[in-house]
Design a protein with these regions (language model features):
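Aromatic "clamp/platform" in nucleotide-sugar-dependent glycosyltransferases that forms part
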Residues: 233
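Short hydrophobic beta-strand element within catalytic cores of glycosyltransferases
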Residues: 250-253
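A short, active-site helix/loop in glycosyltransferases that binds the activated sugar's phosphate group
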Residues: 93, 104-130, 137-141
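A charged, aromatic-enriched C-terminal amphipathic alpha-helix characteristic of glycosyltransferases
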Residues: 285-338
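Extended catalytic core of nucleotide-activated donor transferases of GT-like folds
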Residues: 36, 40-105, 115
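Acidic anion/phosphate-binding donor-loop and adjacent secondary structure
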Residues: 92-93, 136-154
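Conserved donor-binding/catalytic core segment of Leloir-type glycosyltransferases
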Residues: 148-169, 175-179
Length: 342
């Protein structure tokens, strides 16, 4: 098969979406398929929308280009839309609308978590067929090789990492942990590292902050800690918790967004800054049992890409039937609006 992916992978710390594209391109190539990042060829079998926003620097084509491609060059291609973003993630009011408009061109929709699929916007607009394929991290990089569990006597070392610097990434929780570290009861029992970007001029008191890392350097840093914390609000299905967990670190995670479906059984949930201290106490109490479970953590890149390849193969096999269900012009005005860059 020839698969056109509308996002080009970048080297370096670029966030979870970039890691997804990198892993999928690698898996497709190893399976003997050809990956392109444009719509120049007339024999594309599958078109994958990763991000419909043409203003993003790594996006190579958008819904308007796909519409023209299907209409004038190759109506046989099947369009798959991967959805890993939402208004709720950053308390915005325009992402969902862009995704819904882009989704009109899609034959198939894939969400990165059940929480995403169940959002009100998709309960109103979602069409069959749709699937959920969870994100996964690369175990060749993120693994337990260098992990040393907490012994219970030394300070417990927490870590988190984020490419994006929006406050809803959990800064309220990390600030609360910083205040905890400043109290006598925790001063010699707890340390924390934040890897990644922060809003301009912001610092996290009591917390070690280092610049974004990628690949082996990131995995090495994560594995030098004892537990992973994520305070992300309405997380649509990030990869950061996967990378920490696959390095062997039990998870202290916010009960929000997709995090519970990724983290349940492999850590301790909390609601926010007011109860993160209690959650940390439970994690410390149950640490040995949680560490023993971490080798069973399921969300790997191998699992994720296997599910994607299986889906592509089924779609390619059923492409004639899928084409008969397609109606690109069922909403003429919205179809014309697609010709304007998102």
């Amino acid at each position: 098969m020839k698969i056109a992916i509308g996002s080009r992978p970048y080297d370096g710390p670029w966030g979870g979406g970039n890691r997804f594209v990198t892993a999928l391109c690698d898996a497709l190539g190893k399976a003997g398929h050809r990956v392109v990042h444009s719509l120049s060829d007339s024999d594309i079998d599958i078109i994958l929308i990763v991000d419909p926003r043409m203003r993003s620097p790594n996006v190579t084509f958008g819904p308007g280009g796909i519409m023209r491609y299907l209409t004038w060059k190759n109506p046989n291609a099947i369009v798959v839309h991967r959805i890993n973003e939402c208004d709720e993630r950053k308390n915005q009011a325009f992402i969902n609308d862009k995704l819904v408009r882009a989704n009109l061109i899609a034959d198939v929709t894939v969400f990165v978590g059940d929480w995403m699929k169940d959002l009100p916007v998709w309960q109103r607009h979602l069409r069959e067929p749709h699937f959920v394929i969870h994100n996964g991290a690369d175990t060749k990089i993120f693994n337990r090789q260098n992990f040393r569990p907490w012994g219970g006597q030394e300070p417990l070392k927490l870590v988190t990492h984020h490419w994006g610097y929006h406050p809803m990434k959990g800064l309220d929780v990390y600030e609360a942990i910083g205040r905890m570290i400043g109290r006598d009861v925790w001063k010699n029992r707890l340390q924390m590292t934040y890897v990644g970007n922060l809003p301009g001029g912001m610092s996290l008191d009591g917390i070690r902050h280092i610049a974004p890392l990628n690949g082996v350097a990131l995995a090495t840093e994560l594995a030098s800690h004892h537990a992973y914390v994520t305070g992300s609000i309405n997380e649509p299905g990030g990869n950061h918790q996967n990378e920490g967990a696959l390095c062997g670190l039990p998870l202290l995670y916010r009960n929000s967004g997709c995090l519970p479906e990724y983290c349940e059984g492999f850590g301790v949930a909390f609601e926010g800054p007011n109860d993160v201290e209690a959650g940390l106490g439970r994690l410390m109490r149950d640490y040995s049992q949680l560490v023993a479970r971490m080798p069973l953590y399921p969300w790997t890149a191998n699992r994720m890409t296997s599910e994607w390849l299986s889906l592509f193969e089924r779609l390619h096999k059923d492409r004639k039937a899928m084409r008969t269900r397609r109606n690109l012009w069922r909403h003429p005005l919205k179809a014309l609006i697609k010709q304007i860059s998102f």
